[in-house]
Amino acid sequence: MAHRNKVMQSINAPDGSLCVDIFLRPDGSFGFDEFRRDPEDPNGWYSIGHYGATVFKTQQDAEAEAERVVVWLSQL
């Protein structure tokens, strides 16, 4: 299945193993999710936050909530 969401911002942890994507949905709402990748796993990034279903009216609201719930992101 193709992804329909457009990533507006992708923020990587300093070690490169984690990231948070802030995205825009086709309906105009925003969301975010946290992802992890392991160097030994050729499948790439996978969701570990499971925040992707939460809906925000603005990109700024999604960013603020991501910073609140993703510990490493709030420490950058």
Predicted segment positions?
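A generic structural signal for short, solvent-exposed coil/turn residues
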Residues: N12-P14, L24, I48
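Negatively charged, low-complexity tracts enriched in Asp/Glu with abundant Ser/Thr
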Residues: M1-L18
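A short, structured beta-strand/loop element
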Residues: V20-Y46
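Residue-level preference for alpha-helix termini and adjacent loops
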Residues: V7-S10, S29, V55
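Aromatic-enriched hydrophobic runs in primary sequence
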Residues: L18-V20, F30, V69, S74
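Mixed-charge, Lys/Arg-enriched low-complexity segments
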Residues: M1-A2, E40-L76
